Amino acid sequence: MLILAKINEIGDMMGLMIYNSLTNKIEEFKTHEPGIVNMYVCGPTVYDYIHIGNARPVIFYDMLKNYLEYIGYKVNYASNITDVDDKIINKALEQGVSEEEIAKKYEDAYFKNCNDLGSKRPTFVPHATAYIKEMLDFIGQLVNKGYAYEVNGDVYFRVNHLDSYGVLSNQVQEELQNGVRKDVDTKKENPLDFVLWKKTNVGIKWPSIYGPGRPGWHTECVCMIDKIFNHKMIDIHGGGMDLKFPHHENEIAQAKAMYGNTLASYWMHVGRLNLKGQKMSKSLGNVILVNDFKTQEDLMSLRLLIVTQPYRNSISYDEELFNQYKKEYDKFTRAYKNAMLALDYNNYKSNEVIKEDKEAFINYMNQDLNCQNVMSLASSLLKELNSATRAGNLDVIAKKANMIKQIMDVFGVMMPYTPLNDETRKIYNEWLQAKSVKNFEEADKLRAVLTEAGVI
């Protein structure tokens, strides 16, 4: 396998272990195809700008993809756009525009936010509205199998036909039924039954044998996964913890009914990001938008904060925590720039790292993506880098700076440095000269020029 070949270069190490929400265990990660990871993550419903709670899964799964690629996997990463939903329709009606206009506006804003946060575009970005035919075919097959039924133009999934329903949320049907209001939808055979096709004459709709309507949210992802990954069970299905039930539970139910499997081998869930201990939610009005972060420094500080928290736990976000990580990011970027400047000025080029540093990084990451310990490792490397920079030890500077850069590349945290050119090299020499003769006024002016150029 590609991954084993790459890991064996740096020694005999433990393989990647990840927590599987389906089994509630930390398990060794094994793919269906050697060296290839097929991964799907539930994307946004595009009706508004995303807040930093929405951004947490975006950042985490981008980091996961980075790490899988770092250890040698080819990653086929799909994340959808839900571009048909009651919220989109309601906003379109309020503003007197089409659903397509609303969806396009907020999808564009979403990908700009992703890019600003350092998250790369997934390999596949399926749109729900492009798979209506597949969804109707899928629903029809479930009806034929007896797993779904139609009532006056609505189609529901028949939950009690699956003994395994509740496998992801670790609840039995009787317990789940006790928590459901009995008056939600009197057309259902069972309060837990969920909609596959919704009859409607309002907003965007499609013709079907059941009458005009649109698909249920839970069906969209199953059909897109099946189509994109060519009817194969995928390796990882991810999303936020809030999607575990009912959305992901209902995806598994449909996959069990149709294919006899759980859709993915590993189900991963990212904890919530709370604001001062309270759930961040547009409906509560206590949101901080990604758009509120105006500079690359602030965006990367936010990313560093998110990526270094235990991913399955909630984050209690406040300004004090953000400022702490802003200082951390500033420490790393300043040290990295100083190190790269020393190497650049002396024309010292090397891509080497210290074997033990790389082993420590991979061992921590292989422990269910323990980025907290990786951050501690990076802080130790930073101290060693600063010492080497002060001593002018170019070999150690290069190895420590390269390792920090590799870690931050996996984290998706940008480490900016602008290499010297003829002009900035000349200014840098003048700055060193001004400092040596204690012409501090001139030195400050030259430093400002170098800072503006991104050199220091």
Identify the residue ranges that each predicted region occupies.
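Alpha-helix C-terminal capping/helix-coil junction sites
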Residues: 69, 115, 143-144, 268, ...
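Short phosphate-binding/catalytic loops that engage adenosine nucleotides
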Residues: 73, 147, 455
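N-terminal, positively charged nucleic-acid-binding surface of large information/translation enzymes
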Residues: 23-26, 32-118
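The substrate-binding groove and active-site-proximal loops of carbohydrate-active enzymes
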Residues: 93-98, 124-129, 240
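Short, glycine/charge-rich beta-strand/loop segments that flank catalytic centers
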Residues: 81-85, 107-110, 120-135, 153-162
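Alpha-helical recognition segments enriched in aromatics with Gly/Pro capping
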Residues: 5-45, 62, 112, 133-340
